[in-house]
Amino acid sequence: MVGASEEAFAIIEPVIQTLAPENGYGRMGPPGSGHFVKMVHNGIEYGMMQAYGEGFEILRSSAEFDLDLHQIAEVWRRGSVVRSWLLDLAAHALEGDPDLSSLRGYAEDSGEGRWTVVEAINTGVPAPVITEALFARFASRQEESFAMKVVAALRREFGGHAVKTE
């Protein structure tokens, strides 16, 4: 994902060709375009990771079935429309720690997801999956959500709904 003039790209292409996998590089356009394409790529990655996470959580939460998530990941990564390198990584992680008990459900964002969402806003392009994946990362970092306390309080106040207390 290179952003460069055609002349500059012609000079650096032999080096990039040596380092990149076959057909794994290209000139995206003028200077800056490579960063832009990589930013959107990473935003898409946020959405894909979130979808995998949600899917595996649904599978794990099933009361009806005792599912082997590692086995499912292995099957999906070899013969499924959702196969990907990210799924390869999920299979590897689930093989060594099937419940992922060594991890906290905490995910930082490195900036590219935010930049992608800002670009979507600036250009008026709906990007609900990428936006929600970014917001899910924000939520993962909260010990206690004041917003959800307000929601619980309002539900209690207007409808007498049950709430959990400290």
Language-model regions, residue ranges each:
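Helical "substrate-binding/catalytic lid" subdomain
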Residues: 1, 11, 32-161
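A conserved hydrophobic position in a structured secondary element of the catalytic/binding core
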Residues: 4
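Phosphate/pyrophosphate-binding betaalpha-module
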Residues: 7-18, 25-28
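ATP-dependent carboxylate/acyl-activation modules
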Residues: 17-18, 156, 160-166
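Conserved catalytic core of Hanks-type protein kinase domains
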Residues: 18-19, 93
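Structural motif
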Residues: 23-26, 126-128
